[in-house]
A protein has these predicted regions:
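Serine-esterase "nucleophile elbow" of acetyl-processing enzymes
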Residues: 45-113, 123-131
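Bacterial signal peptide processing site
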Residues: 28-31
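N-terminal propeptides/low-complexity segments immediately following signal peptides
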Residues: 35-47
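Hydrophobic helical h-region of N-terminal Sec-dependent signal peptides
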Residues: 17-21
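N-terminal helical cap/lid subdomain that shapes the substrate entry/recognition surface
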Residues: 118
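C-terminal motif of bacterial Sec signal peptides marking the signal peptidase cleavage site
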Residues: 23-26
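Alpha-helical cap/lid subdomain in secreted, periplasmic
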Residues: 103, 121-259
Length: 259
């Protein structure tokens, strides 16, 4: 049992409904109230798409300069950075970290609060208007919080990968491990956890460690909702992801003639 899982179980033992906290916050407070907010958030997060497309086109033209690869972070409110300024969200932090270590990238935040994997499978086609060299997929948390079928989540995530390969066959793809809270029982939690390794094997994509490892269940690293990381927690998320992403980012094509 991981430290994160133990903390989630301790919260549940104290009478705190982890699932309810997750549903109220990670799912964008639910229902119709969040729909307009989610749409606005998506537009805000993707406001740089046109600029990215123009920059990518410029980078693709013959030049003596080094091309800057585009990394698309596609996910939920955890990717969007709900409750944080855009520059505090982990995609922006990773962009800064990559540049500081000599591997400049252009990070595009494609996070959307409250989105299930079914929504992700529908939205990915639109998001892929952004030319990307690498797509980082974070999805499934909202499925788990609602107790939705792990098999359905698996199929939806596989569809996301299939769409990326169809629309942008040159893009590299990585999948991020997500976990379910313990409220639905050990069988559901186990079945949900295993879909990610299954997808990674079937689709031959790298599987990154649990997004919130070392952050989930630790109050000082999360916002008041107890779910979404605060700036300190977000820095840990970014550090953890970068450890896995760095060797992949280092191999991205920076040839000015590509793109």
């Amino acid at each position: 049992m991981t430290r994160t899982t133990r903390r989630l179980r301790e919260c549940a033992d104290r009478g705190v409904s982890v699932a309810i906290l997750f549903v109220l916050s990670a799912c964008g407070s639910g229902g119709n109230v969040s729909n307009s907010r989610n749409v606005a958030e998506a537009k805000n997060n993707m406001s740089g798409v046109k600029a990215t497309e123009d920059s990518a086109a410029t980078a693709a033209a013959p030049s003596t300069s080094v091309r800057t690869p585009v990394v698309l972070f596609f996910g939920t409110s955890l990717t969007a950075g709900l409750g944080l300024d855009p520059e505090q969200a982990f995609p922006s932090l990773i962009e800064k970290r990559a540049k500081a270590e000599g591997f400049p990238i252009r990070a595009v935040n494609g996070g959307l609060s409250g989105e299930t994997t079914a929504g992700a499978a529908r939205r990915i086609d639109w998001v892929l208007r952004t030319p990307a060299d690498l797509v980082v997929i974070e999805g499934g948390a909202n499925d788990a919080l609602r107790g939705l079928s792990p098999d359905a989540a698996r199929a939806n995530l596989e569809q996301v990968i299939a769409t990326i390969r169809q629309k942008q066959p040159r893009a590299k793809i990585v999948l991020v491990q997500m976990e379910a809270p313990p409220n639905y029982g050990p069988t559901y939690t186990r079945n949900f956890r295993t879909i990610y390794a299954d997808i990674a094997r079937k689709e031959n994509v790298p599987l990154l460690p649990f997004l919130l490892d070392g952050v989930a269940g630790i109050s000082r690293l999360n916002q008041a909702d107890g779910v979404h990381p605060n700036p300190a927690g977000e820095r840990i998320v970014a550090d953890n992801l970068w450890k896995s992403l760095k060797p992949i980012v280092a191999q991205l094509d920076r040839n000015p003639g590509s793109g």
